[in-house]
Every structure is written in structure tokens, then in C-alpha cells.
Amino acid sequence: MIKVAAAGGGTGGHLYPLLAILETLAKRVDVKVLFFAVKGKIDERVVRKDHPEFETVSIDVRGLLRPLHHPKNLWRTLKIGIATIEVKKHLKRFKPDLVVLTGGYISGVVGLAAKDLGIPIFVHEQNVVPGLAVKVLSQYAKKVFVSFERTRDYLREWQDKIVVTGCPVRETEKEAPLKDFVLVLGGSLGSEAINELMEKVYPELQETQFVHSTGSDDWTERLSVFPNVTALTYIDPMGAYWKKAIASISRAGASTIAEMMYYGVPGILIPWESSAESHQLENALEAERLGYAIVIRENEASPRKIIESIDKVVKKGKIEKMKENPASKISKEILGEIM
């Protein structure tokens, strides 16, 4: 048995790749997991539901505001210090063989605590541009797994640690009850802008079937009036629908792009440009460069442009599915280092 401590939460973009890694590790060896979740965030809820066998510890911590000299960061830095002491106590008790981190502020806390205790650290960065936690933790990590080759440019000092794997995707045996549809997503909390845009598109494309994850019951009711739209407040598991989709329309979070590329679904990406350090725009442009997507900037998005782009991606057809889940590559690398 190996004991793994893990953190990477606050958003689905950090959480789901981490769960994919842990679930793949568990298929290869007997694993006991200590999971550090952010109190009140998605990881706390999802991990307790999907993995009751994990020991889940909720930590009350919030990330630093931008710019970093923001006056509220003094209080947040104090809370990070308190949280680090709490995490150290749990790590000393659990005695993990390694720590797996996928970014976000909770990763910074757990990673620095693990570094002080001499626990091997493995990091994964989902985005093209690494976040602050990954930049800091890369110097202490045994391996730094990245989704894109271009991420090397942002971590030049740690080239010998970097392994380009792609972004892990959670596997599922489930199948969507529909097929040959355009999948519309706005992230785990939905997207008002995408919902409003698609409400104007649907009447113009009545021969095309859509499955739309709305993020709210109000929007689900509102979009259900269109006979060519299956509106769902939340889709779980996502993989069941990606398997059957012929195209997609979404924001450009790393997990969404990872699933799009893994299942070979061409997409239209409308990046959320207020995301930290322009992560989504950089992710979208890289997916477009690799031939998986058409990028439409939000200030340029119109129903006509979306309709024209849907026609292009549907005609392009599905791309060959990846032969190996990046989660599998990562689990092999980790086990090769510690076994």
C-alpha cells in the first residue's frame, strides 16, 4: 500500500484532473488517500460524495488577491500561515509516501508543509501558463507534469523535472442517452454570456441537436422550450456526453480542453478573459494552434459568428481519440519514482 496526500481545489479545473490521477493510481496499486479540500468549495462536496473512502480534511484558506500588494492579502497571508500549521499536523499523523498537487491556493499550503517535512512532491499544471502555486512548488517537486509543451517556457529553471503528459481526464463507463449532438458548456458554474448567446442561436439551427449544461435551474427551464435542445443544469459524469458529442461550445478552462482533446471533439472556445493571468485565453489559443478549436473572443461573439463556426467544426468531424489518458502516464511516472 502507498499513502498519498493530495490537494488541488477551489475550482473544478484543479479538482477533476487530480481525481483522475488518484483514481488511476488506485487501479494500479492499493492506495490510501488524505485529501485536503478548501472549506466551502467544490472539492469539499465532490470528494466526499465520489470518494467516501478518502480521508477528507477541510481547510479554511483563500488565495491571494491580485495585485499581490492588495491590502486584504495581509490577513489572507496570516490565514495561510495558520492553515500550513494545521496541514503539517495532519501530514505528520498520516505519514504519506508522497504528495500530489494540481494547483490552486490549497496546493501552495499543502506543498510548503510537505516540503518542510521532506515528503516527495509531484505537481501537475493544467494550463498553458502556470499559476503562482505551481511556479513556487516546482523548485521543490520531484516531477512537474504539464499539459502543454509550451508551458516549459514559463518554468525554464526546472526543465529537468518537467514531463509533458497532457491533462488528466476522469474515465467513465456510462453513456449519454443521446448521440450526434453539439455539447454546450459554460464551466462548472455555467456562463451567463454563453447561455444568452445560445438562446439566440437555437431558433436558427432547428435541425441540429444540442445538449446544454446551463449551470442554473432557471436557465435549464428557459432553454428547455427549444425542441432541439436538451438542457441540463449540471452534467455528471462529463465523459458520458463527450463520448457522444460531434462538436462543442465552451469556455476554455483546462479541464474542458483536456476532455475535448482526449475524446477528439472539435470545439468553439469562448475564453473567459477575466480568469487569473489570462489562463483561458492562452489555453484556447494553444488548442486552436493544435487544430482542435476555433477561438472566438467574447467581445466579438455574435449569434451569426457562432452559427458559422458550428458549421465549420461539425464539417471538420471528430478527431482521433487519444490512445492513452494522461492520468495513466502520470501514475506510471509517480510509481516509477517511489516504488
From Swiss-Prot:
It comes from the Bacteria. Keywords: Cell cycle, Cell division, Cell inner membrane, Cell membrane, Cell shape, Cell wall biogenesis/degradation, Glycosyltransferase, Membrane, Peptidoglycan synthesis, Transferase. One of its GO terms (biological process) is regulation of cell shape. Its EC number is 2.4.1.227. One of its GO terms (molecular function) is UDP-N-acetyl-D-glucosamine:N-acetylmuramoyl-L-alanyl-D-glutamyl-meso-2,6-diaminopimelyl-D-alanyl-D-alanine-diphosphoundecaprenol 4-beta-N-acetylglucosaminlytransferase activity. Its main location: membrane. It is found in: Cell inner membrane. Pathway: Cell wall biogenesis; peptidoglycan biosynthesis. It catalyses: di-trans,octa-cis-undecaprenyl diphospho-N-acetyl-alpha-D-muramoyl-L-alanyl-D-glutamyl-meso-2,6-diaminopimeloyl-D-alanyl-D-alanine + UDP-N-acetyl-alpha-D-glucosamine = di-trans,octa-cis-undecaprenyl diphospho-[N-acetyl-alpha-D-glucosaminyl-(1->4)]-N-acetyl-alpha-D-muramoyl-L-alanyl-D-glutamyl-meso-2,6-diaminopimeloyl-D-alanyl-D-alanine + UDP + H(+). UDP-N-acetyl-alpha-D-glucosamine binds at residues 11-13, 127, 170, 188, 235, 280. It is an enzyme of class 2 (transferase). Gene3D superfamilies: Glycogen Phosphorylase B. Signal peptide: none annotated. CDD domains: GT28_MurG. GO terms for cellular component: plasma membrane. It is a peripheral membrane protein. Belongs to the glycosyltransferase 28 family. MurG subfamily. PANTHER family: GLYCOSYLTRANSFERASE, UDP-N-ACETYLGLUCOSAMINE--N-ACETYLMURAMYL-(PENTAPEPTIDE) PYROPHOSPHORYL-UNDECAPRENOL N-ACETYLGLUCOSAMINE TRANSFERASE 1. Cell wall formation. Catalyzes the transfer of a GlcNAc subunit on undecaprenyl-pyrophosphoryl-MurNAc-pentapeptide (lipid intermediate I) to form undecaprenyl-pyrophosphoryl-MurNAc-(pentapeptide)GlcNAc (lipid intermediate II). NCBIfam families: murG (TIGR01133). This is UDP-N-acetylglucosamine--N-acetylmuramyl-(pentapeptide) pyrophosphoryl-undecaprenol N-acetylglucosamine transferase. It comes from Thermotoga maritima (strain ATCC 43589 / DSM 3109 / JCM 10099 / NBRC 100826 / MSB8).
